[in-house]
Amino acid sequence: ELKNILLQDKDQYYQTFFKKDFEVRKINNINDYLKIISKSVCDYHSSEKKKIIDSIEKINTQIKKIKNKYPQFHFIHLDKFLSLPWKFGLVCSKKYENGLPHTRQQYIIFEKKYLENISQKSLMKTLIHEKVHVYQKMYPQDIQYYLNHHQFKKIKPRESKDLIRANPDLDNFIYHDKHFNTYKAVYNNDAINLEDITYFPHDTQFYEHPFEQMAIKFEKIIN
């Protein structure tokens, strides 16, 4: 099922690639990438499933405790968050999206070695972070409230000349905050992979995009 989702590209993620996005993935076109993806998808082993399930159970327990006191956290309705189904995919190669955790439609995608090596505490934070991105896709109106409250404004769509990294967890717009700081992750001049970027206005992922900022803030729901 994951292979079909990645190959069909119904979320049109590959359509957001510009010249630099192709270069850092070492591909000439989308067909090259589809061939790589076909060989990258794999199945979860029972140990990997257990690691994820154990983490989800702890997450749900903690959020349920908080929910009675705070029905919302950073503009995310906790009932809605808990009711969103967890869907996962696994890839066995860093050739697809450099092995970075991300979402495609409602699926959270991990790379096998990343999942093997991550601690449970870090996995819990990553799971929450990525589920926020699923929530953002499912409930755009809630996200608009967040953007309005924090006075984020859309400036323009991303263009090739901006050299901003394509990211399946984000929309394809550039935003600035109430202080007119423009948020972006820009490829370095000598970039050879997806992670060769610099964040602006400050070099931390918090400033890549308002959607990333929201997800990073929400991670703090667990301690």
Name every feature range the model reports, one short phrase each:
Residues I109-L127:
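Short pre-active-site segment immediately N-terminal to the catalytic Zn-binding motif
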Residues L90-K94, K112-Y114, V132, Q136:
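Short, flexible loop/turn elements at secondary-structure junctions
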Residues K87-C92, K125, Q136, Q141:
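Non-catalytic terminal regions of proteins
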Residues E1-K49, A215:
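N-terminal mature-domain "stem" immediately C-terminal to a signal peptide or N-terminal signal-anchor/transmembrane
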Residues I52, I56, Q120-K125, E208-E212:
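Solvent-exposed, acidic/flexible segments
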Residues N148-N223:
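Metalloprotease/metallohydrolase-associated module, dominated by Zn2+-dependent proteases
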Residues E130-N148:
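Catalytic Zn2+-binding segment of zinc metalloproteases
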Residues I30-I108:
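Auxiliary, metal-adjacent structural segments of Zn-dependent hydrolase domains
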